[in-house]
């Protein structure tokens, strides 16, 4: 009896435990927890406020927990990032790019707009009577997603919606005709530059970068466009429109460029374009009409205080020292004109140069045009000995003995290294060195012509071997005076005393010591006019040959205004 009673007791306890062990319904996990559940590591639901926060009395502060940013989004402000709710809403779009309307709004809408927006349209009977036909009634069987843009939290959602639907002609036809205010609001350029724009970028960071560029264009040109309208492929892109012709007061301007101009403005734009086709802009042929044509002073655009240098219409070369002299005379003789020009804008210069076919014309060892000419005509080495003798004679004639001692100390620094490198060279090596020099000079000639920087090239003895046209305009020295036939000009003849001493010190430092062979310094250039000296910033680049011996120095100069 005891055994049977124990079996009955065990069976009863097993049945009771089976009833109590029924699996509890699992909570459905949500893709994003609220801030309180996330902090407590608890399971959350998709509702806001969630059930757990309602039970704990935290429903007023229940919101989505912030997610950890990606590295490429560390510097992006929070206001520009796309919210998670808008990202999820864009995934729920149907095939036509339409999403159901949000059930609640974060802030109340204006009464007029609220009365004109139905909250739900389950069938055709709720369509207003002013719908034009049954076809449009059938298309209005969904709630317009445009109403969701009244909530600040859903602005990005509206932009994402139009990302899929802006180019769809079917959906464009389904826009409710009884929402004219909303239609104009979303399909015309907005007056608010901070309003989110529709975009073709799937990456928020890429869209943010492009939106920033669009905002810059809006601020500078007064033309409010969306991110799609700012692309070169859009219909609103009009390179013929200048920023001055664009409207700035009309915030609801039409999107096409033909509607931005009146008939008179269109004719003016057409005539301006035709004018620019036949008249190539140049320093001597500009659209400005206020050119100061006084014969006493150089040609100048007084609206921007800009003087013209180089070749002129009369065939006369205007050089920088002459302009400086004229400005000084204007300052002394016509102070009113001088003050008027400088009060408008800072002093500036523009240069017009016509490059000759032979940049070193007239000299026996002129610049070769082709590399084949170099290897055919260079049959003997270049003699540096006469150059050194002429350099020493010039230095003794110009400088005092204390300065000559300092120059000699600088030369003594690199003289032993130079003797050691050249002691073992044969005549064929010296011929090859000269071929390398001419070949390098031919390559640099192409660079110097297109750089526009005043440039001069000299040998290691200081003898000038090449002069750019811009350097002649800067200093006023004629090219025939520097590298003409039977002329030997040294770089030290173009520098003042302090700059010459600095030159030898710099050359001794970079000749064999500095492998890069480039340095930047400041020097003063002499001009044919003894009363005019030009303070410049310069960069000297030393070029070595295959034997490691200094071959040439390239000097670039820019005036310090």
Curated annotation (Swiss-Prot):
**What GO MF terms are annotated?**
DNA-binding transcription factor activity, RNA polymerase II-specific; RNA polymerase II transcription regulatory region sequence-specific DNA binding; zinc ion binding
Biased-composition ranges, Polar residues, are: 97-151, 222-239
Residue ranges of every copy of the PAS domain listed in the record: 440-514
- Xref: InterPro entries: ERT1_acuK_gluconeogen_tf (IPR050335), PAS (IPR000014), PAS-like_dom_sf (IPR035965), PAS_13 (IPR056751), Zn2-C6_fun-type_DNA-bd_sf (IPR036864), Zn2Cys6_DnaBD (IPR001138)
Gene Ontology CC terms, in alphabetical order? nucleus
Q: Which domain of life is it from?
A: Eukaryota
Where along the sequence lies the DNA-binding region?
34-62
Instruction: List, alphabetically, the PROSITE patterns matched.
Output: PAS, ZN2_CY6_FUNGAL_1, ZN2_CY6_FUNGAL_2
Instruction: Give the record's GO biological process terms.
Output: cellular response to starvation; gluconeogenesis
Q: Could you list this entry's UniProt keywords, alphabetically sorted.
A: Activator, DNA-binding, Gluconeogenesis, Metal-binding, Nucleus, Transcription, Transcription regulation, Zinc
Q: Where is the composition biased (Low complexity)?
A: 7-18, 78-96, 245-258
Family matches, as SMART domains: GAL4
A Pfam match is Zn_clus
Primary location recorded for the protein, binned into one broad class: nucleus
All disulfide bonds of the chain are none
Start and end residues of each stretch annotated as Disordered: 1-32, 61-151, 222-258
- Which subcellular locations apply to this protein? Nucleus
Sum up the protein's function in the record's words. Transcription factor which regulates nonfermentable carbon utilization. Activator of gluconeogenetic genes.
Q: Give the UniProt family note.
A: Belongs to the ERT1/acuK family.
- Name the chain's protein: Transcription activator of gluconeogenesis ERT1
| Taxonomic lineage from the root | Eukaryota, Fungi, Dikarya, Ascomycota, Saccharomycotina
């Amino acid at each position: 009896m005891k055994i049977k009673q124990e079996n009955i007791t065990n069976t009863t306890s097993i049945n009771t435990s089976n009833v109590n062990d029924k699996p509890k319904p699992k909570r459905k996990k949500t893709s994003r927890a609220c801030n309180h559940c996330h902090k407590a590591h608890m399971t959350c639901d998709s509702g806001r406020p969630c059930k757990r926060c309602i039970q704990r009395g935290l429903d007023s502060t229940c919101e989505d927990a912030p997610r950890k940013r990606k590295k490429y989004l560390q510097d992006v402000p929070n206001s520009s990032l796309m919210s998670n709710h808008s990202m999820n809403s864009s995934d729920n779009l149907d095939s036509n790019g339409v999403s159901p309307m949000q059930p609640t709004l974060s802030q109340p809408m204006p009464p007029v707009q609220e009365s004109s927006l139905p909250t739900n349209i389950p069938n055709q009977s709720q369509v207003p009577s002013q719908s034009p036909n049954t076809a449009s009634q059938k298309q209005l069987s969904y709630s317009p997603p445009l109403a969701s843009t009244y909530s600040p939290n859903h602005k990005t959602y509206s932009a994402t919606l139009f990302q899929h639907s802006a180019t769809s002609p079917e959906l464009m036809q389904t826009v409710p005709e009884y929402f004219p205010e909303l239609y104009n609001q979303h399909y015309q350029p907005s007056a608010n530059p901070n309003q989110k724009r529709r975009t073709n970028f799937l990456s928020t960071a890429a869209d943010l970068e492009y939106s920033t560029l669009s905002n810059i264009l809006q601020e500078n040109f007064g033309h409010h466009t969306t991110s799609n309208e700012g692309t070169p492929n859009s219909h609103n892109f009009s390179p013929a429109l200048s920023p001055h012709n664009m409207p700035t007061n009309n915030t609801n301007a039409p999107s096409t460029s033909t509607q931005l101009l009146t008939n008179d403005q269109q004719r003016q734009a057409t005539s301006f374009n035709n004018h620019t086709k036949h008249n190539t802009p140049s320093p001597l042929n500009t659209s400005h009409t206020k050119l100061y044509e006084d014969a006493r002073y150089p040609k100048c655009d007084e609206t921007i205080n800009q003087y013209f240098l180089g070749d002129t219409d009369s065939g006369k070369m205007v050089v920088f020292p002459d302009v400086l002299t004229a400005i000084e005379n204007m300052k002394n003789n016509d102070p009113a004109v001088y003050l008027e020009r400088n009060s408008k804008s800072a002093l500036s210069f523009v240069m017009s140069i016509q490059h000759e076919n032979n940049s070193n014309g007239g000299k026996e060892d002129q610049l070769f045009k082709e590399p084949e000419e170099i290897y055919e005509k260079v049959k003997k080495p270049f003699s540096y000995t006469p150059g050194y003798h002429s350099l020493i004679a010039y230095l003794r004639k110009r400088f005092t003995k204390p300065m000559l001692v300092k120059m000699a100390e600088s030369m003594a620094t690199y003289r032993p290294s130079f003797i050691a490198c050249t002691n073992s060279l044969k005549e064929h090596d010296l011929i090859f060195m000269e071929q390398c020099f001419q070949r390098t000079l031919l390559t640099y000639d192409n660079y110097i012509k297109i750089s526009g920087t005043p440039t001069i090239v000299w040998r290691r003895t200081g003898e000038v071997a090449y002069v750019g046209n811009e350097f002649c305009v800067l200093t006023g020295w004629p090219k025939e005076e520097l590298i003409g036939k039977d002329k030997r000009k040294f770089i030290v003849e173009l520098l003042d005393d302090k700059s010459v001493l600095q030159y030898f010190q710099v050359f001794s430092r970079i000749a064999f010591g500095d492998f890069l062979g480039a340095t930047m310094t400041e020097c003063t250039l002499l001009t044919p006019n003894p009363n005019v000296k030009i303070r410049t910033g310069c960069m000297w680049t030393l070029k070595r040959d295959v034997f490691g011996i200094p071959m040439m120095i390239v000097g670039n100069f820019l005036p310090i205004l």
